[in-house]
Amino acid sequence: MSGNTLGLLFTVTTFGESHGPAIGAVVDGCPPGMTLSEADIQADLDRRKPGTSRHVTQRKEEDKVEILSGVFEGKTTGAPIGLLIRNTDQRSQDYGDILQTFRPGHADYAYHYKYGFRDPRGGGRSSARLTAPVVAAAAIAKKWLKEHYGTEFYGYMGQLGEIEVPFQDKKHIAENPFFAANSEIIPQLEGYMDELRKAGDSCGARIEVRASNVPIGLGEPLFDKLDADIAHAMMGINAVKGVEIGAGFKSVSQRGSVHGDDLHPDGFASNNSGGTLGGISSGQELRVAIAIKPTSSIMTPKHSVDIKGQPITVQTKGRHDPCVGIRATPIAEAMLALVLMDHALRHRAQCGDVELAVPPIPASRPGSQLD
Amino acid sequence: MSGNTLGLLFTVTTFGESHGPAIGAVVDGCPPGMTLSEADIQADLDRRKPGTSRHVTQRKEEDKVEILSGVFEGKTTGAPIGLLIRNTDQRSQDYGDILQTFRPGHADYAYHYKYGFRDPRGGGRSSARLTAPVVAAAAIAKKWLKEHYGTEFYGYMGQLGEIEVPFQDKKHIAENPFFAANSEIIPQLEGYMDELRKAGDSCGARIEVRASNVPIGLGEPLFDKLDADIAHAMMGINAVKGVEIGAGFKSVSQRGSVHGDDLHPDGFASNNSGGTLGGISSGQELRVAIAIKPTSSIMTPKHSVDIKGQPITVQTKGRHDPCVGIRATPIAEAMLALVLMDHALRHRAQCGDVELAVPPIPASRPGSQLD
Amino acid sequence: MSGNTLGLLFTVTTFGESHGPAIGAVVDGCPPGMTLSEADIQADLDRRKPGTSRHVTQRKEEDKVEILSGVFEGKTTGAPIGLLIRNTDQRSQDYGDILQTFRPGHADYAYHYKYGFRDPRGGGRSSARLTAPVVAAAAIAKKWLKEHYGTEFYGYMGQLGEIEVPFQDKKHIAENPFFAANSEIIPQLEGYMDELRKAGDSCGARIEVRASNVPIGLGEPLFDKLDADIAHAMMGINAVKGVEIGAGFKSVSQRGSVHGDDLHPDGFASNNSGGTLGGISSGQELRVAIAIKPTSSIMTPKHSVDIKGQPITVQTKGRHDPCVGIRATPIAEAMLALVLMDHALRHRAQCGDVELAVPPIPASRPGSQLD
Amino acid sequence: MSGNTLGLLFTVTTFGESHGPAIGAVVDGCPPGMTLSEADIQADLDRRKPGTSRHVTQRKEEDKVEILSGVFEGKTTGAPIGLLIRNTDQRSQDYGDILQTFRPGHADYAYHYKYGFRDPRGGGRSSARLTAPVVAAAAIAKKWLKEHYGTEFYGYMGQLGEIEVPFQDKKHIAENPFFAANSEIIPQLEGYMDELRKAGDSCGARIEVRASNVPIGLGEPLFDKLDADIAHAMMGINAVKGVEIGAGFKSVSQRGSVHGDDLHPDGFASNNSGGTLGGISSGQELRVAIAIKPTSSIMTPKHSVDIKGQPITVQTKGRHDPCVGIRATPIAEAMLALVLMDHALRHRAQCGDVELAVPPIPASRPGSQLD
């Protein structure tokens, strides 16, 4: 199937461009009988939407979702769920210049040579705006996983540019525009962003995502390991340059005697695995981290060439996100939810329905989740 | 399609277990008319095979591949290519004990609860032995990519446990059992491995993979970005816990003014992107890094439980790899080749045949590849 | 991928229900650079739309399509093409009764037991209205195939109930509401339909579809033969109960000496194969026939049961098609076009781009097409 | 996925050529825990194998299957099941001549122009020999369906050339080499075949296939209707030119008042639908018919051309099947079983596990199956 569909059984097919009339998704394979309304979806969309603080793009989009199909009298019918979000704040008058140039770090160059030309309006299909339908689709997955397994998702910023953001408490995440699980570091982050904006520059971010109450047994050997499909989904988010599961790159310098998570009758003693063993969920908390590169659209002039290969200087004007990572947390959660949902269905196809298989030992040990 | 098939158009479906009668793969979608013989495949298999140095598993396997189909008078016909490798050194007499226990860090626990029971002989399906058919299949992809685009692959060890392995020269890679691109560090690596083995412990590794002469335009928005499919393939390799493209996690603390690779009439000035822009190959060298966790089978006793949840102590006896990362380089190359091959076919399906589209500017600038 | 997507590379994912707010499709994998506007699509939609004669459903739908994405400055960009058709004539007030009963021959019974309940409004997802997005999507495929290979499609009614409709001339097809390639039989067909309507009954139809200038080489052994994928697509149309390629069921009683189409330097002498050999297009005219069952919604009372299994009598009131086959011709053409388009892309993925491979002998011989 | 894989969740990937070293299949997605041995598979293979009567090809093949993987201690593990059948009776010495010519009705012409050349040995990939791995794979599906739902399959010859073969009793099918459910017609069929062989000609056949105890609810709207996937699978069998479900082409001339199967508290009153409603199984007996064309390899000379387009005469020498339809019954059963198995898993993925959902009314009424 083509590149705009995610998943094998719970599939999300998106369409739309940044400055076209609308964006949206078709969600197929949703189990029937689940209550669903626009309100269930809107909450997550609102967490992602632009313009919520001065640190992100000032584009004004309500991101109001319309369910076009797949729901009857408030319940999913098993038919595909059409989701539509109209674009309202397109400003595409003056892209003519952009069409002739390649902005360093942007998709321009690759799109141009792949397709022969490109839609330059706000990045077209390569815009981060296209994560909105993904977040909308994932809200459906989250609801089902919550109802069936009690699965819960949360994400938070682990690092903003050079500043590490220590995890204090989950409750802080919703209290600030950075999705920081930390109540004291916000002024420092705000100062950092203001300085960046003044310098006409941008920075990257590290986002952490977690899922708890994940059923044991999700993921398929060999190629479609749960972590492999998570890596695929995460690396599919705009600007992501790295993905880690559990100890990630730290495991390179760990000894085996340290890395392997001991098992005790009351659960795993640690979580270096990040919740997967042999590519299959172990019931422990799933732990994923992603690296997001600094925004390419900056006010600082950069060397580039035009489509004829002639040297030019490129400098972004107008609104932009100095750190796309700030709004990435709900997107990363969404991707994780979509992968789990797809694998929950794949698992019950092959192995039958299970309501969170509970082994003689609990999957997690008190206090083992945050080592 | 189920989890044992990789790719959409150039598909590799593997089968087999560590200690079953045979392992193998069916490679479908190969373009017709390419000369192919067992010899083309055997070379890569030999680079991966066990028992080549004292630092890896001492299992004796010839890994001799037989082509069962898809080739007529030395040429691929377009029909699926069946590849068969007989297992010869199975020692599965005494697995009874293993069946009752979960080895920390192993797939045992997850397989047991997913499938209800498991094949314990040498790890069954979760054994790293199953990378052999992948390497065999990828040899076909490499050959085609080389003939069509001049694409070349190489990988090397970037770090062994705590020891960084500086890149000196590609030519050294084949001169030592570590795939180190460095001629001086070998004694240090050997000493480190000997010490680990004495300590009954294991370590992780960081592997770097590169592809040059990659056509511009490979990769599909949105979900099947080239880097997304690379991440999927790499995370599907046993023991991989992290994947990076280009600057990877370093991009978190980079400024946009630094990260974005400038373009000049003679090529890109740097390669922080790792060869993809917007998920599409830019023609620059592809750069991927993976983190491999330390081997779970160690001589050091670990706490665990048996399948009834009772506490036990687990200690591996007999042959094992103290660092599975040592043999991972050809496997990582193989995965990269399979992803590129699949996307080369996907690209020409949608956009027509191209023989390495050459833009007015060359994709790489003299000296820009190793910054 | 789930059941609402057709195709591997040129994929059509539809959504919507008969009486929901909208129906539509996402068309992914379209080659870039083709001029496309709503007008290109509307023509085929208009041929399919209801209410065009007194012999079909009187539902009033404009079936006006909106392109939501994938086109920039009048050209396809390679991004997914979102197509939206708003429903305007929904009359869903009084379905309460239908929800409790199973109409004989309808999907009610199967949907109810598959999903646990169903959307009863106008048949919900099982309505023939859902062929509109398919026709819209196929208009894109037809345009591309025409431009690249000169491929042309036409279909016609071969039989209406008990009345065979002899083929006279292609030009007549557009001159009557039955898609009959015959100018003299129309009064007889009209009389037959009027009589049926008076009797409160319905009838089936046999539709013939043809494609000419089909490139040689489309179709993939083993399972995805061109004819296999055509059969899949055709049998996916509502009410279709049979599919034939070429001589079809007549080939059962043919001798091999008669059935096998002789080859001469000026082309094939006959076309019993229907344009495929070994599941691959031979360049001859593609010939497909489908059987459409009589409409299940009839004014004649039928025995049935309610959802509790109690006996009831079911009798349709209000508007309905006495022969859904009358409007099926453009739908069958659409399905054929989608399959050819998908296989055209699949072929050039594996075998490279070909502009209608021309063998030393022409694929068709003068006069051989209509034997 | 490429064309040599059937199914979405229960996937069968075949490889091999008629005269290569081996043929085989990888069966992926099989539920774990089912007992399975070669003996379970061999029985169906033996029903299909050549050389069992004087009316079929005299090629001597034992068709002995080896299970290479996916089974541990006699039970399926959930890992892919590798199946291998060595070819033993290849006679490929003198194909040189065939390579230069196109045999009318054969795949030669299409393969040649698709791939640029072809494997001529016994038809290569296009040989009916490749149905052996399909039959082997389907034996696994049949076993699982039988154990879970009590599903049973049988097929029989409905017509041989011009001779209709009336259905008398299922028990006769295994008593004659024609799979005729009729004990009296056998001498007539044998005489017909002897005459054909003397005439150097061949004939077609009509095969009927049935499945009973099919769970309600299998099949997916819109495109992957159960009947659509059945049509795809059946048309994928060599030499099949037509597929019917239930009343098939007879439904064209049926009135709606006759065609629609009445429902009564004790079941359906008839079975014109053939066991599907809206593309979803209704629990009634599944009824499929296929048309098989006469064998193309005949002793009668036919006009053709060589690969340079020059006129030639083609005449088959040596062993051949004068009616490939004679051995097609177990193949058609196999295809039906594979489709049902795949949809059984797809259904429980989306809708949860069901052990043959039993509605308040039974799916079939006493005596309704053979109307």
Swiss-Prot record, chains A, B, C, D:
Pfam families for the chain: Chorismate_synt
Keywords on record: Amino-acid biosynthesis, Aromatic amino acid biosynthesis, FAD, Flavoprotein, FMN, Lyase, NADP
Biological-process GO terms, alphabetical: amino acid biosynthetic process; aromatic amino acid family biosynthetic process; chorismate biosynthetic process
EC code: 4.2.3.5
Gene Ontology molecular function: any one: FMN binding
Enzyme kind, highest EC tier: lyase
Chain residues that bind NADP(+): 48, 54
GO annotation, cellular component aspect: cytosol
Known partners and oligomeric status: Homotetramer.
Entry's family note: Belongs to the chorismate synthase family.
Function: This reaction introduces a second double bond into the aromatic ring system.
Name of the molecule in the record: Chorismate synthase
